Amino acid sequence: MLKPLGDRVIIEVTEAAEQTVGGIVLANNAKDKPVTGKVVAVGSGYVLNDGSKQDLTVKSGDQVLFDKYAGQEVSFEGADYLALHEKDIVAIVE
């Protein structure tokens, strides 16, 4: 399994819709880049100025919204993930 470092988070991305609400099938280049996903792993946290650590707000299993162009795509053991910093996560979906 992937173990991110520091304030990084590994996201299993939710795929973009294949067709519109009206039933129009979208070409691959017409789909919006996904902005939602499930957190599958989190780093150990932030190192503060005094040397202490602060845990991340998100945790494994959280469904999140993130910035459209954030992160780096990563493939591991045949699966695709997105590695990003916690600051690029906009919200936790409840």
From Swiss-Prot:
An example molecular function term from Gene Ontology annotations: metal ion binding
CDD domains cross-referenced by the UniProt entry: cpn10
UniProt KW Transferase keyword: no
Taxonomy, superkingdom: Bacteria
Subcellular location: Cytoplasm
Membrane recorded as keyword: no
Gene Ontology biological process terms, A to Z: chaperone cofactor-dependent protein refolding
Any one annotated GO CC term: cytoplasm
InterPro entries referenced in this protein's UniProt entry, alphabetically: Chaperonin_GroES (IPR020818), Chaperonin_GroES_sf (IPR037124), Chaprnonin_Cpn10_CS (IPR018369), GroES-like_sf (IPR011032)
Keywords annotated in UniProt: Chaperone, Cytoplasm
A Pfam family assignment: Cpn10
Entry function: Together with the chaperonin GroEL, plays an essential role in assisting protein folding. The GroEL-GroES system forms a nano-cage that allows encapsulation of the non-native substrate proteins and provides a physical environment optimized to promote and accelerate protein folding. GroES binds to the apical surface of the GroEL ring, thereby capping the opening of the GroEL channel.
PANTHER family xrefs: 10 KDA HEAT SHOCK PROTEIN, CO-CHAPERONIN GROES
Record's subunit section: Heptamer of 7 subunits arranged in a ring. Interacts with the chaperonin GroEL.
Family per record: Belongs to the GroES chaperonin family.
Protein name (database record): Co-chaperonin GroES
Gene symbol of the encoding locus: groES
